[in-house]
């Protein structure tokens, strides 16, 4: 089927500001959509309120409105621009909710605007809890015992019928907002009230809580002709009850039998077809690990966080293909850009393992609850690719920037390990590893956590290897350690070896087809093998520049750094360079396989980056656009003889090191609050006493106010310094007199 020639002018609704549950993945999806529309010769009207996005660039749309994302604003722009079509499935829940409101009011029909892609009826069937439940019943797909409530009293009546505990799921919300697990009527009363307020249609689903079942996702794709494929299966490390955005996710699903896989794949294809979804769709299932019983949890009838993860995990660009389908193309008419030989109706095949690890903001909010549930708390995520689960997991952990390069995390409380295993929190992975090292049986850990035995066995492999390492380093142990994903620094620390054998990583290609066809798009991940597919990949002969990305989205370091990195790449390409980018965030435009000339999906650490430099031999490295993640690597790269492009390593250190910067200001007689650089608790207490309270404590090499604090007495200084010193700082902490007043910022170039 050719392009729908009735489509001349399309409005695209973005996702607005980054919030928990709706982050950079929608800029990635929206930017892909705008590019596809422009390439098709369609006039694009973009509405988004977030200026720190690639999609709001002039090159990606004909008309750009940086306006509040409200129904009133969208109506006003539709009246002015008169688009014939509206694409709403790529802007997260925001765009979907607004489009549905305008459709229900009859505004779209009255002004000749049609929803392209998935229509309003299909969206309603997926998002409205009662309609969804009715549809599942009609096609014979099992759902968890549940009922709809529109008020608190009804929710209490439902819970008394189906039995506690129950999960509350508000309709038309994102990231589990307003939901939660209630074990008592008192808890349900609070959660139901919150959930009703969170739902734009004041509707909640009260559902039986099935503790211990596996949570499995299928990312699917369907065109208007009814062709449907499963793009990717994904499995949550945590059982049902933890929001998928807060769970470690593995792709493809690794613990399913063939019967279980085929059963859930068939169910996902039945569901997307019955709902009438046109484009990408995410289906979530609960699977009883002790039988073949399963239940449908929910469906997202739009591009989602899981879509971005599945796209980067497989190399199958879900947002791009969703947009082409919305334009009228069918799956067999859309080419696979990575192989250049297959079409979009081929289901991707993975010959590697992908692990996603969430990035939580608890370092910013030290006193907040770390308990994980159905409301998402993570601000971002990292992704790692490797031949094995163990290697992918260790890559993800060190790439998450949580000051860890192994699973040996210091406990946060004095509780014994078995007690801590009962806590569903962000430290659970590390607590499980601690328990395995302490000799707790896999069966006992599974009984407490309900984490699948397969994952526990893989973690035990690492625990046993570390115990073996304590006996000393050998060549064989070194190679096993590298294949498990350990860095040289970690292996030296765990073995006590002063000198290690050395082996550099080689790079394999993501090709969507399990190496059945040669890939044309250079998208690489590291492993320890004999053949390096990156070295063998043909080069243009141009000089190469390596750009470091910014890693996971976190408070203080958000999508604006991806925006900067992408513009850096585009500019360098225009200047005639081959550009290589290194990043590990699956939500971003920078990790699109066609942004740079070559993409390395790797952790942003010294060893990982140096291995890439050895293969690529760039004339220099750009660190200026990767936020604090890239800046922190400057000293190491400079000391290794790598040229830093832009501001020199010495210049960066002068600005980032608090003590050196203070001395610079002093030498130029520039006024600033009186301050002193300190490295110990005693120095900090003495400085604070001399300056007089309140004082401001600020570490070096941080962003977004990370670990900055105003303190009012010696006890607060002691508490702060103990926390900072436990992270192993290299540069001074500045103690300066806190001054009340206005703050001004000036950008210079």
Where are these regions (language model features)?
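Amphipathic alpha-helical
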Residues: 184, 334, 490-524, 713
């Amino acid at each position: 089927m050719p392009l729908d020639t009735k489509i001349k002018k399309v409005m695209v609704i973005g996702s607005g500001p980054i919030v928990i549950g709706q982050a950079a993945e929608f800029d990635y999806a929206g930017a892909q959509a705008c590019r596809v529309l422009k390439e098709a010769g369609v006039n694009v009207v973009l509405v988004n309120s977030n200026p720190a996005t690639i999609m709001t660039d002039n090159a990606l749309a004909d008309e750009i409105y940086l306006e509040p994302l409200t129904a009133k604003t969208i109506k006003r722009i539709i009246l002015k621009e008169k688009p014939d079509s509206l694409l709403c499935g790529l802007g997260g829940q925001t765009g979907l909710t607004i489009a549905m409101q305008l459709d229900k009011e009859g505004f779209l029909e009255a002004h000749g605007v049609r929803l392209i892609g998935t229509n309003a009826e299909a969206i309603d069937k997926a998002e409205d809890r009662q309609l969804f439940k009715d549809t599942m019943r009609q096609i014979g797909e099992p759902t968890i015992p549940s009922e709809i409530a529109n008020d608190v009293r009804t929710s209490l009546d439902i819970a008394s019928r189906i039995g506690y505990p129950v999960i509350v799921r508000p309709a038309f919300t994102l990231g589990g907002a307003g939901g939660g697990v209630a074990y008592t009527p008192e808890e349900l009363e609070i959660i139901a009230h919150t959930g009703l307020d969170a739902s734009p249609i004041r509707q909640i689903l009260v559902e039986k809580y099935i503790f211990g079942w596996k949570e499995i996702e299928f990312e699917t794709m369907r065109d208007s002709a009814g062709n449907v494929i499963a793009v990717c299966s994904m499995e949550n490390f945590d059982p049902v009850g933890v929001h998928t955005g807060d769970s470690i996710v593995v792709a493809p699903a690794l613990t399913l039998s063939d019967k279980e896989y085929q059963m859930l794949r068939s169910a996902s294809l039945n569901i997307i077809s019955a709902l009438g979804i046109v484009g990408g769709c995410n289906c979530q299932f609960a699977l009883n690990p002790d039988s073949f019983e399963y239940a449908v949890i929910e469906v997202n009838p739009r591009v989602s966080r899981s879509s971005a993860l599945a796209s980067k995990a497989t190399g199958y660009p879900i947002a791009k293909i969703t947009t082409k389908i919305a334009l009228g193309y069918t799956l067999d008419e859309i080419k696979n850009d990575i192989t250049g030989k297959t079409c979009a109706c081929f289901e991707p095949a993975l010959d590697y393992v992908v692990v996603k690890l969430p990035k939580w903001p608890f370092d910013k909010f030290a006193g907040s609850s770390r308990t994980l549930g159905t409301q998402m708390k993570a601000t971002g995520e990292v992704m790692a690719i490797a031949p094995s689960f163990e290697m992918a997991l260790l890559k993800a952990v060190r790439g998450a920037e949580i000051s860890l390069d192994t699973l040996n995390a210091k406990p946060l409380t004095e509780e014994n390990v078995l007690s801590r295993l009962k806590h569903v929190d962000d430290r659970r992975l590390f607590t499980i590893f601690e328990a395995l090292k302490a000799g707790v049986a896999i069966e006992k850990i599974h009984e407490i956590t309900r984490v699948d035995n397969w994952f526990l066995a893989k973690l035990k492999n690492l625990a046993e290897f570390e115990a073996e390492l304590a006996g000393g380093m050998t060549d064989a142990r070194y190679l096993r350690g590298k294949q498990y994903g350990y860095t040289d620094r970690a292996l030296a620390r765990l073995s006590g070896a002063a000198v290690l054998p050395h082996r550099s990583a080689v790079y394999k290609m993501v090709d969507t087809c399990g190496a059945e066809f040669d890939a044309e798009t250079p998208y690489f991940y590291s492993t320890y093998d004999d053949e390096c597919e990156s070295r063998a990949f043909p080069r243009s002969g141009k000089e190469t520049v390596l750009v470091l990305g910014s890693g996971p989205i976190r408070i203080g370091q958000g999508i604006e750094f991806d925006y900067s990195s992408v513009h850096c790449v585009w500019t360098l390409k225009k200047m005639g360079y081959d550009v290589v980018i290194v990043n590990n965030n699956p939500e971003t435009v920078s990790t699109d396989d066609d942004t740079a000339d070559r993409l390395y999906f790797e952790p942003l650490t010294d060893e990982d980056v140096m291995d890439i430099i050895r293969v690529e031999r760039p004339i220099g490295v750009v660190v200026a656009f990767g936020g604090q993640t890239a800046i922190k690597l400057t000293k190491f790269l400079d000391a290794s003889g790598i040229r830093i492009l832009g501001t020199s390593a010495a210049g960066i250190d002068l600005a980032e090191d608090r003590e050196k910067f203070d001395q610079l200001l002093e030498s130029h007689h520039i006024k600033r609050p009186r301050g002193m650089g300190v490295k110990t608790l005693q120095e900090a207490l003495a400085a604070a006493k001399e300056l007089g309270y309140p004082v401001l404590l600020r570490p070096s090499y941080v962003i977004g106010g990370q670990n900055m604090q105003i303190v009012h007495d010696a006890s607060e200084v002691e508490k702060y310094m103990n926390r900072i010193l436990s992270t192993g700082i290299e540069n001074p902490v500045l103690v300066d007199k806190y001054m009340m007043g206005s703050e001004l910022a000036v950008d210079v170039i």
